[in-house]
């Protein structure tokens, strides 16, 4: 009995999000085509600054410690498409993200 295996080349994309606390700021995707990196709109970085100032964290080690890179499960989309989809989702959900971030100030 002869077994023949066919290997399909899959696009395996590694996606990650740079965020400060729960506020995303940069989305990155890596696949065999290279790296795609997109910074979210300015309102996200402005939100980080506002929350950090209100918490008195600007210029402190604690501010720096709140920056994290979260890796997402691998995707079969291209890096370009995966990043585009995540960026669109975050931009649509900005008000929700802002509300959550500001509620942490209470």
Placement of each model-derived feature along the sequence:
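Intrinsically disordered, low-complexity regions enriched in small/polar residues
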Residues: 5-8, 21, 46, 65, ...
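Acidic, aromatic-enriched beta-alpha/helix-loop junctions
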Residues: 32-69
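Alpha-helical context
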Residues: 16, 20, 24-27, 58-62, ...
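Short, charged/polar N-terminal "headpieces" of proteins
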Residues: 2-38
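Acidic, low-complexity intrinsically disordered segments
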Residues: 59-106
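Generic, low-specificity signal for short hydrophobic/alpha-helical stretches with a mild N-terminal bias
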Residues: 26-30, 45, 49, 72, ...
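Charged, low-complexity, helix-prone segments enriched in Lys/Glu/Asp/Gln
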Residues: 14, 44-54, 83, 90-97
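Short non-domain terminal segments
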Residues: 1-4, 42, 88, 92
């Amino acid at each position: 009995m002869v077994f023949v295996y066919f290997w399909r080349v899959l696009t395996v994309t590694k996606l990650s999000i740079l965020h400060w606390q729960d506020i995303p700021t940069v989305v990155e995707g890596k696949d065999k085509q290279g790296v795609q990196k997109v910074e979210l709109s300015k309102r996200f970085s402005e939100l980080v600054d506002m929350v950090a100032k209100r918490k008195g964290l600007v210029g402190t080690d604690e501010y720096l410690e709140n920056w994290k890179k979260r890796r997402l499960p691998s995707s079969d989309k291209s890096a370009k498409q995966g990043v585009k989809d995540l960026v669109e989702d975050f931009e649509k959900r900005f008000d929700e993200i802002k509300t959550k971030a500001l509620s942490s100030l209470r």
